[in-house]
A protein has these predicted regions:
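FNR/FR-type flavoprotein reductase catalytic core
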Residues: 74-141
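Ferredoxin-reductase
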Residues: 2-84, 137
């Protein structure tokens, strides 16, 4: 599988909930190659291990990807310190992604918690043919 690596600028940052952050990153080459269900590896500044983070948005026209992650340790806390204009070291797209069924009349997408964001590109692909069922730990999420 072909993947790309580089330093890409953060265009948007949102705090979605306690310990839950969303970023939009400008990386046209990765966005052009990405498919629903794939992920990227992001290297937090000062760390040696990359963090795998699922894609929750792919905009091929704008050349952006969107990621959402939960703060779980020092690596994701370092990533969450990035602000608009900062660059992230991104490697991707990785993984095989979801199997797309272009002829499907109806699909049901089921996810829970931090497993919901990767379903967004899939729901966008199927549009009105998709029924989405999402579960969360609490109303805060």
């Amino acid at each position: 599988m072909h993947y790309l690596q580089g330093r890409y600028p953060v265009l948007e940052k949102k705090i979605l909930a306690k310990n839950m952050v969303q970023y939009v990153i400008l990386c046209p080459e990765i966005a052009a190659a990405a498919q629903p269900g794939q992920f990227v590896h992001i290297l937090p500044v000062g760390h040696t291990l990359r963090r795998p983070i699922s894609l929750c948005g792919i905009d091929k026209e704008k050349g952006t990807i969107c990621i959402v992650f939960e703060l779980k340790g020092s690596g994701t806390e370092t990533l969450a310190a990035c602000n608009v204009g900062d660059c992230m070291d991104v490697l991707g797209p990785l993984g095989h992604g979801f199997t797309l069924l272009p002829d499907a009349k109806r699909v049901v997408l089921l996810g829970g918690g931090i497993g919901n964001p990767p379903m967004l590109p899939l729901a966008q692909y199927y549009q009105e043919r998709a029924t989405v069922i999402s579960g969360f730990r609490s109303a805060e999420f």
